[in-house]
Amino acid sequence: CFLWHVRKRVADQELGDAPFLDRLRRDQKSLRGRGSTLGLDIKTATRAGKQIVERILKEESDEALKMTMASVPASRYLTDMTLEEMSRDW
């Protein structure tokens, strides 16, 4: 949930490319599925993740550091991509 909110912030600032945005949408569906499978309240979990991201962004004044923190999961989404996604003409 935390990483999803970090990615969402990047997308909201229009810094994500097409594969990044596609991954964000799939992650959102995946979170819903995992929540129901595990019997978790996904709204509570995503709210907690959002609060963590907002606190980091509020407390950190260095813009470059904010972007570094926000881009950390970006390398992970590439490794999680399927062959179909990698071969897609974006």
UniProtKB/Swiss-Prot annotation:
- Nuclear localization signal (motif): residue ranges: 22-26
Q: What is this protein called?
A: Non-structural protein 1
Positions bearing the Glycyl lysine isopeptide (Lys-Gly) (interchain with G-Cter in ISG15) cross-link: 8, 29
Q: How is it modified after translation?
A: Upon interferon induction, ISGylated via host HERC5; this results in the impairment of NS1 interaction with RNA targets due to its inability to form homodimers and to interact with host EIF2AK2/PKR. There are two ISGylated forms.
Q: Which residues form a coiled coil?
A: none
Gene3D superfamilies membership: Influenza virus non-structural protein, effector domain, S15/NS1, RNA-binding
Q: What does the domain comment read?
A: The dsRNA-binding region is required for suppression of RNA silencing.
| Cellular component, GO annotation | host cell cytoplasm; host cell nucleus
MF terms from GO for this chain are:
RNA binding
Q: How does it assemble?
A: Homodimer. Interacts with host TRIM25 (via coiled coil); this interaction specifically inhibits TRIM25 multimerization and TRIM25-mediated RIGI CARD ubiquitination. Interacts with human EIF2AK2/PKR, CPSF4, IVNS1ABP and PABPN1.
Functional summary from the UniProt entry: Inhibits post-transcriptional processing of cellular pre-mRNA, by binding and inhibiting two cellular proteins that are required for the 3'-end processing of cellular pre-mRNAs: the 30 kDa cleavage and polyadenylation specificity factor (CPSF4) and the poly(A)-binding protein 2 (PABPN1). This results in the accumulation of unprocessed 3' end pre-mRNAs which can't be exported from the nucleus. Cellular protein synthesis is thereby shut off very early after virus infection.
Q: Which InterPro entries match?
A: NS1A (IPR000256), NS1A_effect_dom-like_sf (IPR038064), uS15_NS1_RNA-bd_sf (IPR009068)
User: Where, by residue number, does the polypeptide cross the bilayer?
Assistant: none
Pfam families noted in UniProt: Flu_NS1
